[in-house]
């Protein structure tokens, strides 16, 4: 997804003072093509208006040939002028690079999984936020996060990847990178006038944290630090489309936070996000709750109709660019402590325990013979533990016999019920060919009778009841409510529930 954040007030008018006029603006929607989103925060979405108050809007097509030619011309001409001392001839201009399609990792990569490109529209002020998706889609495992961060860190150490922060300082190489970043913003934000993007990126009060791979800019974040107020305002952020799904968006934001804290002395970031960008900001630690004193930021940034003001507090101790190492060390410390208190890390060999018909074991095995069970804290009195055991004799042997008799009685009552006929035998696949494709865990009264008679399968009443309930559930899953099978299952289930309750009451009275 592509996008930008609200521009600094100094660029909304002709002046560059920190206390520029305080006006409200609307966030017009802007369409983007070839924008993608993934669940790993690698793409971003817009968070600011797509038009400048002082410049006319551009055509909405990001693939305009004139637009691309202008972008490339500006970079080639600028490079030649700075490094060679003279502009190149128009006929000798190098061909355009193939990877001209880009996507912004703007101060906002919005929703985590957007399967369609057009769902990554920029600055969609009329978009609706899905609160459920905001939390369910943004779930990210720390294991995957750490693996990506460590991979990118290795690339940085190898020199293939750099994260550098520069402003308009007049250095040739830095200026070339800034022009490249400007082109990324311009391609990805078609409704944002180029002149306005240039004004912010090249303004000396703004800084740009850039992702540089093999000496080529592949993305960046432009922001304005208000050092006297100790907060920064994010303006633009983008990652090229062919470098997405690699974690650059998150890594870029982490570098920005650490640089803003250590170099600029900032404690907070503020930005205006549209609804599509909120998801990305939440992943990066932004919230809609503004804790920063209003006196510190009011009048320094603009209010925008259709935008959501979001804040990120920069932690003063977190190693943002080395979070993966911190997480790994924390896990190691926790794992070592667990090993001191438990032997759960020991893996025992499996058990050769073959079963025959109806799931009844060929031979019995005492729980105490299972390796590791006692070491895990098991005690013999836990065998056959049941909530309903209080209704039976405290003696285990007597309890087992009473339980078996109860289950036999229940099965007898079930078999005699007039609605039990569909459940007495296993379903014949020759009569119902697709039954076992739909019902993966079949059960019937005959199979349950075999399990009861083995006196080895049902060690608690709850196990018996669970099988019976599954039988009713299977019937209701396979058959529609208007069928006789569904109705039989409903009536028989009600009968069974009442019978279990009455039998337990009788057993409790006797004991």
Curated annotation (Swiss-Prot):
Region described as Disordered: 1-152
Stretches with biased composition (Low complexity): 1-14, 44-65, 104-125
Biased composition (Polar residues): 88-103
Enzyme Commission designation: 2.3.1.48
Binding-site residues, acetyl-CoA: 237-239, 244-250, 276-279
Tissues expressing the protein: Expressed in roots, mature leaves, stems and panicles.
Active site per database record: 233
Pfam families named among the record's database cross-references: Acetyltransf_1 (PF00583), Bromodomain (PF00439)
Domain N-acetyltransferase, chain residue ranges per copy: 168-315
Cell location: Nucleus
Limits of the Bromo domain: 398-503
GO cellular component, one term: histone acetyltransferase complex
Any single biological process term in GO: response to light stimulus
Gene Ontology terms for molecular function: DNA binding; histone H3 acetyltransferase activity; histone H4 acetyltransferase activity
Function of the molecule: Acetylates histones H3 and H4 in vitro. Acetylates 'Lys-4' of histone H3 (H3K4ac), 'Lys-9' (H3K9ac), 'Lys-14' (H3K14ac), 'Lys-27' (H3K27ac), and 'Lys-5' of histone H4 (H4K5ac). Acetylation of histones gives a specific tag for epigenetic transcription activation. Operates in concert with certain DNA-binding transcriptional activators. ADA2 and GCN5 function to acetylate nucleosomes, opening up the promoter region. The ADA2-GCN5 histone acetyltransferase (HAT) module is recruited by WOX11 to regulate crown root cell proliferation and stem cell maintenance of root meristem.
Protein family: Belongs to the acetyltransferase family. GCN5 subfamily.
Quaternary structure and partners: Interacts with ADA2.
Protein name: Histone acetyltransferase GCN5
Organism: Oryza sativa subsp. japonica
Classification of source organism: Eukaryota, Viridiplantae, Streptophyta, Embryophyta, Tracheophyta
């Amino acid at each position: 997804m592509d996008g930008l954040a609200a521009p600094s007030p100094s660029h909304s008018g002709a002046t560059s003072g920190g206390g520029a006029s305080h006006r409200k603006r609307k966030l017009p929607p802007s369409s983007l093509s070839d924008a993608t989103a993934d669940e790993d925060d690698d793409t971003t979405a817009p968070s600011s208006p797509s038009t400048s108050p002082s410049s006319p809007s551009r055509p909405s097509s990001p693939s305009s040939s004139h637009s691309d030619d202008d972008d490339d011309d500006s970079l080639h001409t600028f490079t030649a002028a700075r490094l060679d001392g003279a502009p190149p001839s128009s006929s000798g201009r190098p061909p355009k690079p193939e990877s001209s399609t880009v996507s912004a990792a703007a101060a906002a990569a919005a929703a985590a999984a957007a399967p369609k490109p057009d769902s990554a529209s920029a600055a969609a002020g009329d978009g609706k936020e899905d609160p459920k998706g905001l939390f369910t889609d943004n779930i990210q495992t720390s294991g995957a996060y750490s693996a990506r961060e460590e991979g990118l860190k290795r690339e940085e150490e190898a020199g293939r990847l750099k994260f550098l922060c520069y402003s308009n300082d007049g250095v040739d190489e830095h200026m070339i990178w800034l022009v490249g970043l400007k082109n990324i913003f311009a391609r990805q934000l078609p409704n944002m006038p180029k002149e306005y993007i240039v004004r912010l990126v090249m303004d000396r009060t703004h800084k740009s944290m850039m992702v540089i791979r093999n000496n080529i800019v592949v993305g960046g974040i432009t922001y304005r630090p208000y050092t006297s107020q100790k907060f920064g305002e994010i303006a633009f952020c983008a990652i090229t489309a062919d470098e997405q799904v690699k974690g650059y968006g998150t890594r870029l934001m982490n570098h920005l936070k650490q640089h803003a804290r250590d170099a600029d002395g900032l404690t907070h970031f503020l930005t205006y996000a549209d609804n599509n960008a909120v998801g990305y900001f939440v992943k990066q630690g932004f919230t809609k709750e503004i804790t920063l004193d209003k006196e510190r930021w009011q009048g320094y940034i603009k209010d925008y109709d259709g935008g959501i003001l979001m804040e990120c507090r920069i932690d003063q101790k977190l190693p943002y660019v080395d979070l993966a190492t911190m997480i790994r060390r924390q896990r190691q410390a926790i794992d070592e402590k667990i090993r001191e208190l438990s032997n759960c890390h020991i893996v025992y060999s499996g058990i050769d325990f073959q079963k025959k018909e109806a799931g009844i074991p060929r031979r019995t095995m005492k729980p105490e013979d299972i390796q590791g069970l006692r070491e895990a804290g098991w005690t013999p009195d836990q065998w056959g533990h049941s909530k309903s055991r209080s209704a039976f004799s405290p003696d285990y042997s007597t309890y087992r016999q009473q339980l078996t008799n109860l289950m036999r009685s229940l099965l007898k009552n079930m078999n005699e019920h007039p609605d039990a006929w569909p459940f007495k035998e296993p379903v014949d696949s020759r009569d119902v060919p697709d039954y076992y494709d739909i019902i993966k865990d079949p059960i019937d009264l005959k199979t349950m009778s075999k399990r009861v008679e083995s006196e080895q399968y049902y060690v608690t009443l709850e196990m018996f009841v669970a099988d019976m309930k599954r039988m009713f559930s299977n019937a209701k899953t396979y058959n529609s409510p208007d069928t006789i099978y569904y109705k039989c299952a409903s009536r028989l289930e009600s009968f069974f529930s009442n019978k279990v309750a009455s039998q337990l009451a009788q057993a409790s009275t006797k004991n």
